[in-house]
Amino acid sequence: MKTFSNKVLTKPEAEQALDTAIALVRRNLPLYTDHCQNHSSVHDIYPQCENNQWTCGFWPGEVWLSYERTGDEAFKNTALTLVDSFLYRIEHKIEVDHHDMGFLYSPSCVAAYKLTGSEKGRKAAILAADQLCTRFQEKGEFFQAWGALGAADNYRYIIDCLLNVPLLYWASETTGDAHYADLAHKHVTTCLANSIRPDGSTYHTFFMDPVTGGPVRGATCQGYKDDSCWARGQAWGVYGTAISYRYTRRPEYLDAFRRVLAYYLERLPEDLVPYWDMTFTSGTEEPRDSSSASIVACGLLEAAKYVGNDEAAEYTKLAAQMLGSVAAHYAVKEGPQGIGLVRHGTYSKKSPYNTCTPEGVDECVSWGDYFYMEALTRLTKDWELYW
């Protein structure tokens, strides 16, 4: 595994960085209690939005992390107000015909249940798990990401779903119904069989045959091109395999973690924050994606719990080096109400070869803020994950 000489963020420095982030979250509470936070900033300031985006769960996660650190009831009250909104959303099926139930309901409602015993949070999260199960395709054994169920042009999954299926592992734990975890395992097995290339890089999306259920081809939506490696997709691969190993202890998941991590590390620039696609490694004006660094740091710190001491020490050091770079060069230290926590994220960059709509390029992105805080929290204590 590749190693680096970058500065390691110490525990006191992580605590200071976390407290700086929490101060910004506190300042933003009035803006995002009765509204949600947009998926990405505009000139570093997040517009308000209704609770109808796939990213709306990350801001409540930041608020819960702030509550964990401070014990301040102001954070708890805002987060519980948001739980009401998430329960309403899933009960009324508002923009939930997609696979992103984990991103929405784990950091908002599972967190609420774990931290406060909120029955509304538990109910909303179980309903969200039920909704995710409706996306499961028996032919191919995967959760269809987008579009009309069964439609040939959308008969595919995306690697991001590795962070959605933990909602199902949790649902099995809390209800005693193994069906949720069984579907999660089937999806992860399909994903790891098809989405990881021989060199450890990953496809963003993967099409399956709606008639036979067999694999068809990998493709990108938000990466540079089909055969490149979208940085955030690779990051989802790192963290998602670590979480699936946490719930299942299946050795093939840990093997996959090591493979995707090794590729990710080989393609990093000097400051350990990747460009938005890993086809770019240095000497380019292409934008970075700071969110990927924080996501991978979370995966490293989760995996460190389940490996030998030497390997765990390597993972912890790597995570602290990545977070040291983000904290020093990308994190916001102060700013007006509405400002994000981490600059230089990339939501969706158009290229001549991809199909995405350009949004949130070189901006703060809501998941980047959340995973930065989660990773810092992991460095400061033995954290019970929301996923």
Residue ranges and their predicted role:
Residues 1-387:
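Glycan-recognition and catalytic cores of secretory/periplasmic carbohydrate-active enzymes
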